[in-house]
């Protein structure tokens, strides 16, 4: 994928702040500090474009990144950080639900989980939420450089079993550090847009 332009256009907490151009979107969901910002930076080959936070749970807005003036990556607020107050968790839930239930431009959701660990109850709930709202789900298994390639299938099987994934749904191991899996991930991003009738320029 040739990246000609990329910019953050909006940080939103309610519908009135969402972009209104009708440009298609793919959203990234995952636990706090699972690596969403790092994945965005890696996909765009830009360092510190999407800011990585040292404070889990800090991102509480929906961030829209416009790529090549053709499509959006949407960075959803991280979940699962125990030290966040109950009121903040409820606020997060409202922000997420409003986006997922009403966003016609949203094509698919990519759920990020740490390949080293069994998905958490929050990951399972997020997966079920994605399916409840009728979206395709692709799982990105982050931090793939932390285990050997020979262990990939074992860990992917654990992820599939814990989330109770459909056999047709993909799990893609990705390392932001070593760029492992980035090409396959781009192919799947383009594929998801194509499935929804959008032609994305790849070169």
From Swiss-Prot:
Pfam families cross-referenced by the UniProt entry: MMR_HSR1
- What biological-process GO terms show up in the record? division septum assembly
What SUPFAM superfamilies does the annotation carry?
P-loop containing nucleoside triphosphate hydrolases
Q: Give start-end ranges for the coiled-coil region(s).
A: none
Q: Does the record carry Isomerase as a key word?
A: no
Q: Does the keyword Cell division apply?
A: yes
Which residues are recorded as binding Mg(2+)?
37, 59
Record domain EngB-type G: where: 22-195
InterPro entries with a match to the protein in the record: G_ENGB_dom, GTP-bd, GTP-bd_ribosome_bio_YsxC, P-loop_NTPase
Q: Which GO terms describe its cellular component?
A: cytosol
Keyword line: Cell cycle, Cell division, GTP-binding, Magnesium, Metal-binding, Nucleotide-binding, Septation
Q: What protein family is recorded?
A: Belongs to the TRAFAC class TrmE-Era-EngA-EngB-Septin-like GTPase superfamily. EngB GTPase family.
Output the NCBIfam families linked to this UniProt entry.
Answer: GTPase_YsxC (TIGR03598)
- What does the UniProt record say this protein does? Necessary for normal cell division and for the maintenance of normal septation.
Q: What is the recorded name of this protein?
A: Probable GTP-binding protein EngB
Gene it is expressed from: engB
């Amino acid at each position: 994928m040739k990246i000609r332009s990329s910019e953050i256009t909006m940080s939103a907490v309610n519908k009135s702040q969402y972009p209104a151009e009708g440009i298609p979107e793919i959203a990234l969901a995952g636990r706090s500090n699972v690596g969403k910002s790092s994945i965005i930076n890696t996909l765009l080959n830009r360092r510190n474009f999407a800011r990585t936070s040292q404070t889990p749970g800090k991102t509480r807005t929906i961030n829209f990144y416009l790529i090549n003036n053709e499509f959006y990556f949407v960075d959803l607020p991280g979940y699962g950080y125990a030290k966040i107050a109950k009121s903040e968790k409820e606020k997060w839930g409202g922000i997420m639900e409003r986006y997922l239930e009403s966003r016609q431009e949203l094509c698919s959701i990519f759920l990020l989980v740490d390949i080293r660990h069994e998905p958490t109850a929050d990951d399972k709930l997020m997966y079920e939420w994605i399916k409840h709202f009728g979206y395709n789900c692709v799982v990105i298994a982050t931090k793939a450089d932390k285990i050997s390639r020979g262990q990939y299938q074992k860990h992917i099987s654990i992820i599939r079993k814990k989330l109770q994934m459909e056999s047709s749904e993909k799990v893609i191991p990705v390392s932001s550090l070593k760029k492992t899996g980035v090409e396959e991930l781009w192919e799947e991003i383009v594929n998801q847009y194509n499935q929804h009738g959008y032609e994305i320029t790849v070169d």
